Amino acid sequence: MREKIKLESSAGTGHFYTTTKNKRTTPEKIEITKFDPVARKHVKYKETKLK
């Protein structure tokens, strides 16, 4: 079953993306480079819990 997760910016701007992932096939935490519109550059986004 796919679970909702939050990808939070490592730039400290407070910006985040929400997405889903299959916990059975990818049990480890996701770390992706995406665009941060607040910082106006590409930064790493780390998976956190969606509250």
Swiss-Prot record:
<dbReference type="GO" id="GO:0003735">
    <property type="term" value="F:structural constituent of ribosome"/>
</dbReference>
<keyword id="KW-0687">Ribonucleoprotein</keyword>
<dbReference type="Pfam" id="PF00471">
    <property type="entry name" value="Ribosomal_L33"/>
</dbReference>
<comment type="similarity">
    <text>Belongs to the bacterial ribosomal protein bL33 family.</text>
</comment>
<dbReference type="GO" id="GO:0022625">
    <property type="term" value="C:cytosolic large ribosomal subunit"/>
</dbReference>
<dbReference type="InterPro" id="IPR011332">
    <property type="entry name" value="Ribosomal_zn-bd"/>
</dbReference>
<dbReference type="GO" id="GO:0006412">
    <property type="term" value="P:translation"/>
</dbReference>
<keyword id="KW-0689">Ribosomal protein</keyword>
<dbReference type="InterPro" id="IPR018264">
    <property type="entry name" value="Ribosomal_bL33_CS"/>
</dbReference>
<dbReference type="InterPro" id="IPR038584">
    <property type="entry name" value="Ribosomal_bL33_sf"/>
</dbReference>
<dbReference type="InterPro" id="IPR001705">
    <property type="entry name" value="Ribosomal_bL33"/>
</dbReference>
<protein>
    <recommendedName>
        <fullName>Large ribosomal subunit protein bL33</fullName>
    </recommendedName>
</protein>
